């Protein structure tokens, strides 16, 4: 269900805002491994300008899809116990040393999104543990 919710929002981001989001966190790892990991939420990375000066565009997409903003600081929304949070894709560079220009794009039913490779997930989880 979470993957379907991500794809629904990713499609909206692709079409309305020309954003290719990065499926991040446990749900992204679940997708990369093709293994169920019981991801608790949906974490998505997008260009930083959409977390700042263009934030209202994201809010509009989420509200139009039945989500309510519940944590502005974390850029987090909720719908039917599904938490959907945004962060900056550019933060991967200083945080984990990931070259965002080399992240592969997945095209699933004409919905485009970035998905980290396993070695990049290792960099993220290593950086998170420090």
Give the role of each language-model region.
Residues 1-130:
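Compositionally biased terminal segments of proteins
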